[in-house]
């Protein structure tokens, strides 16, 4: 059986039933405390200090937190505090002021209560590495106003390296049985108004417990260890119960049980100011550890996309846009067949659709047939024909370009025949970077014809066809008065800037998926601050994070930490791109002065001036063929270097500067 390596495992368990001075007694608090104490001692190896009823008077409680615990608690150890009793909350200057009610408290005399802020300050002064408080009392959630920040939720899979980090780094967490404005139930009735709830294996059948305490003991017995699920004859779980997993288990059970009694009670979790990258953990009784190693870290396993957009293959690394994904998904049930996803350059329009909407649609809506994502390019009719080829027999596919160019009704007919063969399916066409109808289409007439084809097929087949297009906001005016103007206002879906919480998810969660950490954790705050006020900065952020990851690989460290020192050396979010572009340019010119002219040639091809602003332009490789073999060799070297540096993106039919990369280059 595995063991946790802590200098000490100490639990202080308090339960008060018999209050004096006219305060209503409780029925289960002492039984809850005794059962929790037994569980911790017998199944989790804790040394337990159990205090009940008169031992929970104000004097002994203050002595406990101010004198006994500082003398008992060891550095490098772990401490668990459990309290079952009365609690109240009153309005304070900075939110609800919470109090634990000692056994000898006087009703209405605040001086006879134990302020949660005093408890917080005394506890956070202790030298232990891990601390977990569990409060089962009314208004217990008021304790969060004494804490500093919400907890960070751990990924579904716990790797060995993350478990080691959880144990070694400070973990200071609090789980409460009720929110700051909720009462906690003493006994939950399942049969009548004073029934009992079974406390689980190993407990006396007639014993009664609060819903929270009963769920807590079931969770600590192994109920909260449910990930990964059971498979191949192996039980569910990995042998570890984290505080976060325990909280989720408690929330799911207590909320349902208490809501059934019309007395909703919502457990909460938060962290204290001492908390860092640790997590309070328990080992599951009778379960061997089953922790996979963290994924290998190499250039191919980079969790950040740099200047490239996310595709469906990268959906497991795409975070921060859940709300917008759900909104887009809902539009596919609306009567409006066209959705135009609008945003300034660098807001992640393409990624939202390709890595957000499409994977979620595939998971939830098997009735949708999704065509491959298309981009108009310089021949939009040809691009549309290539995408629609999968809707027709192979013998017809070769004639599609000519059909669509000659006959506006051809697309209507093709989609109609597909629907006859698939009457229960819906069809989705995604047009990415629709501004290419202006920036790249070689014929304005063909660009307009493309819009007319789209408009007509929507009008004819609106009951089963949906179209989602992405478009840079600065090109919107050039489409509003064209063929689609009648549908435009209903079609608009403007991506809002990311909130700080969304940015935090986009920064931290891809790193968590690779079991990477930010050192110090405040580096995440710095990254958020650097991009929060910069419209369209997501590609710059992603590039900086990608470079930060590559710096980690170059250091050959084994701590899996992305560091603030490396971030400063990169020049921050904005400076990292310019620094990398300058580095590649200077290295090329050092090899041969002729590269200065070649780089200029290549990069000027990748931008276009539209409406007084620079726009990225995808360049067919045929445009980068020059008169001499020597120059062509230099062009190929430039492209290889810029692509390898993730400054330029190679597609099937050409190359383009990464979003936000063209100007820097």
Language-model features: where?
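Amphipathic helix/helix-loop-helix segment enriched in hydrophobic residues with interspersed Lys/Arg
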Residues: 154, 162-165, 200, 225-232, ...
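Cysteine endopeptidase catalytic domains of the caspase/legumain-like
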Residues: 1-301
